[in-house]
Amino acid sequence: MAADQTGRIYGTIGGGNLEYQAVKKAMTLAGKDAHFVEDFDLGTGENGGLGMVCGGKVKVLFYSVKSQDPKIASFLKEALKIAEEGKPYWLLLPFSKGYPKIESHLEEGRGHCRILEKYENDETQKIYAEEFNFDGKVYIFGGGHLAQELVPVLSHLGFWCMVMDDREEYTAPNLFPGVQETKTVDFTALSDILKVKKEDYLVVVTRGHRCDADVERFALRTPASYIGVVGSKRKTQYVRDKLLAEGFTNEELDRVHAPIGIDIASETPAEIAISIAAQLIQIRAEKAGLRRKK
């Protein structure tokens, strides 16, 4: 979580009184060379604490950043570049003195969050290390009402989104707050313009079953981790039967989530967007869990 001297924050360490007290502390550190760990007692007992029913103790690492420092500026540029490229990386923050670092690989320790000990300059220092994985792009086929409701939600959840439609008026970026890219395409020639990776998500919300079939035909030939198609059970079955007749197998078609989204009895575009977002959150969490078990 980042906080500035005004109390404005980005991210969270869990909310509640712990976060409130941590932000208050961080506000006093702006512009200072302050790197330290502070213990917070979450209890409600006679010996003090933050009065939180959950109880326990938490260690919070405070690391003051001066944006004018050339080394900090260089670090931030490197982090932004790696994030834009979609590469996994490790963020390393020293417990006391020193600068944050980016590492592409980390052999020491276990888990996606680690406390390491590094020997540098004749002394041993503890380092906090956290893994950041790029979890794929969301390619949305169809720029109608549903896509316009879906993109802002997914963007807020940290998903990278691209919207495609064969109608230029439905690819105007201003229709999709938070979108990274839009493109007017021919749904029958997607393989000429898209290189889908196994970590990517394909969301099919076109205007009709013919376009759905064109996109689904393309999607089934990709390694995408998720393929979802909007529509009634009758429409999705029609497209499935059509693709079976073309030679696709039931096993291949079972990759497709159709109708798309989790079942929350959604009806409006806004409600369906929430059901799709929930399903993508679930898939992303499952993928992250598998990565962390390896």
Show the residue positions of the predicted features.
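Short glycine/serine/threonine-rich phosphate/pyrophosphate-binding segments
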Residues: A147-L150, R210-V215, T236-Q237
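ADP-ribose/adenylate-binding Rossmann-like module
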Residues: M164, Y201, T206-R207, R217-K242
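Adenosine-phosphate binding glycine-rich loop
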Residues: V230-K294
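Short, structured coil segments at secondary-structure junctions
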Residues: P177-V179, T222-P223
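Segments forming oxygen-rich coordination pockets for charged ligands
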Residues: M1-D166, Y170-F176, K183, Y201, ...
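Conserved SAM/SAH-binding loop
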Residues: V185-L190, R210
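Short amphipathic alpha-helix with an adjacent loop that forms part of the alpha/beta core around
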Residues: T188-K198
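Active-site-proximal loop->helix
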Residues: A172-G178, R240-A245
